[in-house]
Amino acid sequence: MGKVVGIDLGTTNSVVAVMEGGKPVVIANAEGMRTTPSVVGFSKDGERVVGQMARRQTVLNPQNTFFAVKRYIGRRYNELSPESKRVPYTIRKDDVGNIKVACPRLNKEFAAEEISAMVLKKLADDASAYLGAAVTGAVITVPAYFNDSQRQATRDAGRIAGLEVLRILNEPTAASLAYGLDRGDTETILVFDLGGGTFDVSILEVGDGVFEVKATSGDTQLGGNDFDKKIVDWLAEQFLETEGVDLRRDRQALQRLMEAAEKAKIELSAVSITDINLPFITATEDGPKHLETRLTRSQFEGLCADLLGRVRNPVKRALKDAGLRPDDIEEVVLVGGSTRMPMVKQLVRDLIGIEPSENVNPDEVVAMGAAIQAGILAGEFKDVLLLDVTPLSLGLEAIGGVMKKLIPRNTTIPVRRSDIFSTSENNQNSVEIHVVQGEREMAGDNKSLGRFKLYGIPPAPRGIPQIQVAFDIDANGILQVTALDRTTGREQSITIQGASTLSESEVNRMIQEAQKYADVDRERKERVEKRTRSEALILQGERQLREVALEFGMQFARNRRQRIDNISRELKESLKENDDRGIDQAYADLQDALYELNREVRQYYAEDEDDDLFATIKDIFVGDKDKERDLPRDSYRERDSYNNRDYGRDYGRDYGRDSRPSYDSNRPPRKSPRPSYQDNWDDDDDWL
């Protein structure tokens, strides 16, 4: 039987760990290092090198050496920012809009999943050599804020590497496993994970073997590389000002700048000033040029002020979503090499008010947590319960473009949620299920994850068919959507994978815009609902007039039709012109007109009942001989049929006033009423 390991697939570095003797152990790679650079390169001979060997050739072979591809995995080219495209190698868009990295040495293009698979393969091979047995399975960690497609792409990378991916685990959750496995008392912790390319913050309750995530937030396009780029830009701007040459346009010079920036960043975590010397960085007509300068810690912190602001916001959002104050946090666990920067530690102190824990290795704790999860799946731990959450709300598009949320963000997974929907048109034989992800009220403002159709719905008036839509999120965070016609039993489903994905900038924009434009979203939603109610009231009026004409004759209906038709026409014009005030006025007038029609019908019934009472008394005293002469009118029986129809159903549900009586009569019918359309639609049900 093959071995199972835990892998932290990082943007900058990756780590592999395994359970030994009931404890997680980090496995050193073939070069003797406990961390492996997430770098893949191809030498002059076309040989593939991974890890530290690939990193050594980045300066001399920048176009054929690929790093930080985790930022591209599961994403589309049009989602990349100009900043994320600024790397020494070439990024291209394929025919379907996905991201490819070009390798001139092999005259070939690779997907980000393929490059990541090469790193995973290196880690698995090194682990196999250490364990003396083949590694066949893995628990792989991803940022908590990775969306569905990014998680699926990570799983695909594992499959390409020949691994069975047993679980996709959120990085902060993995860190909490390694931190709190042996802790008995329950405490509330905040995991602050700032890695090379991603940032996550999660709040958990940990203790007695239970790890429950309360809230998560983050930014998958923020990490240590962004702090490096601040130094790169500072150096390049200085050189451009003094020498008139932009080093960022030279691939080799750019790679040297990036290496020097990372080195300076690391040194400034221990000292207050560092020297940066890059001899022969470029050459002009005047000869070779050198870059020599000094950078202080205070200068570096000033350059990164905006990045610290981006770090601060997710922490506040996670606290708000969890319903906690900073003083409710009992422990802060720092994860990721970038948390070693003094300004980051100080930011955590300022936000939470306590000293961060130094009990775990920020580079290794995530892989150790992944190994523990592998042990849980293998049955090595019997009394450990892990409750993770989904980072963004999931729902579908309802009538009018409104997003109907089925699974709110920070819902514990695995989870299944369902709701009942119906058709929006008469005799509609199919419905389209449009799955969206985000926090805005309107579906068009959120991210589309996929679409599929359910066919074969029996013809019926709008609102009568019942379509049950179910969302299932498994423990890996992978979403499956199922639609079921409850009348016919027909079912259609889709697993959301390979769809257009969310960039972190889009995620942050969705949440920020949802807060900024909450009032605007609410007004738009109310406007759509008002339009839907108005259109339904117009249809109700037309239906009632037809029924009245059938029961009482055209003359009775004609006297009342003109007013209702005029008001309906005004309401339609107001809807066409988007005149909110006109819609409100015409809607109220139409309600009144239909109420008056209802009142007259009930009054007509009351008079009919009085006539029947006198006829009964006459029969008692006179006998049956007058019946042949004075036969009852057929319309009497027909009126009872009309009376027992549920005309007040829609009216009482959406449009009626609570103080007004119903159209229904409790008097038993004299004969079975003529069949009419009925439905059992609830107030909370929505129309697709």
Curated annotation (Swiss-Prot):
Query: CDD domains, per this entry?
Result: ASKHA_NBD_HSP70_DnaK-like (cd10234)
Where is the region Disordered? Answer: 630-688
Q: Which GO terms describe its molecular function?
A: ATP binding; ATP-dependent protein folding chaperone; unfolded protein binding
The UniProt entry, under Pfam families, shows: HSP70 (PF00012)
What triggers expression?
By stress conditions e.g. heat shock.
> Which keywords does UniProt give here?
ATP-binding, Chaperone, Nucleotide-binding, Phosphoprotein, Stress response
Which residue ranges have biased composition labelled Basic and acidic residues?
Answer: 630-661
The domain of life for this entry's organism is Bacteria
Where Phosphothreonine occurs, the residues are T198
Which InterPro entries does the entry link to? ATPase_NBD (IPR043129), Chaperone_DnaK (IPR012725), Heat_shock_70_CS (IPR018181), HSP70_peptide-bd_sf (IPR029047), Hsp_70_fam (IPR013126)
Q: Which PANTHER family match?
A: HEAT SHOCK PROTEIN 70KDA (PTHR19375)
* Biological function: Acts as a chaperone.
Q: What does the sequence similarity comment in the record state about its family?
A: Belongs to the heat shock protein 70 family.
Record-linked NCBIfam families: PRK00290.1 (NF001413), PRK05183.1 (NF003520), PRK13410.1 (NF009946), prok_dnaK (TIGR02350)
Which protein are we looking at? Answer: Chaperone protein DnaK
* Natural source organism: Trichormus variabilis (strain ATCC 29413 / PCC 7937)
